[in-house]
Amino acid sequence: MAKVLVVADINQGVLKRSTAELLSKAKAIGAETAVVAIGRNIESLIPGLVDAGSDTQYVADDPALELFSAGPYASCVVEAAKQFGADLIWFGFSEGGKAVAPRVATQLDAACANEITALTLEGDQIEVIRPAITNKVIQRVKVNTDRLVAVIRAGAFEATEGITGSENVVKLSAPEPDSKAVIKELVSDASGDIDLADADIVISVGRGTKDQAGIDLVKELANDLKAGFGSSRAMVDAGLMPHNKQVGQTGKIVAPTLYIAIGISGAIQHLAGMNGSKVILAVNKDPEAPIFNVADYGIVGDLFEVVPVLREEIKKIRA
C-alpha cells in the first residue's frame, strides 16, 4: 500500500480547500494517508484534518513557525516524511508549496514534479500528467524513483464528502531557524476579498473594462455573487489591478466551479491560469475574441450594458 503525506495548506490559521482535495485523492487510490501541518496555534485544525481523511497528523506548532520560511518548513516536511515512510509527498499549488517542494525533494533524494493535473499509481509505477509550453502540450511522465514530491494544480482533484480518517497526532519539534534568510514580516492582502484559490466563483476583468469605472462595476457583480475578484496581466501591467489578483501563467492558477471573464480577450497566458474551471462564461464586445473558443457560455456585448442586466437578474432570482 502506498503512503501519501499531504502538506496542509494553511493561510492565516485557515485550512485551504486544496488540503481536502489532496487527502480525498489519496483515499481514492487506496493509500495510507497522513498530513503534516506547520505553523503557530494550529492544533485547532486537527479535527478538520481528520474529517478530510488523514489517518496520522504530524503537527509542528511553534512560535518560531508563525511566519513562513521555506527552509524550516521543508525540514518539518522531511521529518514527517521520514517518520511516516512516505512514498508520495503532495503539496497544493501555492507560492509556499512551490518554494518548499524542491527543497524537500533534494533532501529526500526524490523526484519532484510541478503543476500536476493527474496522477496514477499501478503497483510501484507512478505516472503523472502535467501541462507544458503554456498548456500547448501535455506531458505524461513516468517516475523512476522510490519517492515523488508533487505540487498539484488547484482543482485537479475533487474533495469527497463523507470520508473521514482517524486521529493519531504526532508532534514535531521546530527546526533550527534558517541562518541564510530571516523573515521579518508577511504582508497579507488587506482588501478583504475572497481568496481566488478557494473561491467557487471567480470573476476577472481585462482591458475591455477600460478604466476604474469598469472595474468598480464588475467588482459590484463579484460582491453580489460572493466571488473572488481577479484580472488579466494587462490590467496589472497598466497599474489598474494589483499583481496578487492576476490570473494566468505568471499569476494565480484557479479552478472554480464558475469562471466569468469580462473584457478579457483570451491570451494563452491567461487561459493557462483558468482553463481548469468547471464552467466558463465570457463577456466581450468582440465576437472574434479567443476567449469564446474555451467558454461554455458567451455574451457578446459591452460590459456597461451586460453587467447591470446580470446584476438585476441575480436580484430577481434571489428575491
Identify what each model region corresponds to.
Residues 1-319:
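N-terminal glycine-rich FAD/FM-binding segment characteristic of electron-transfer flavoproteins
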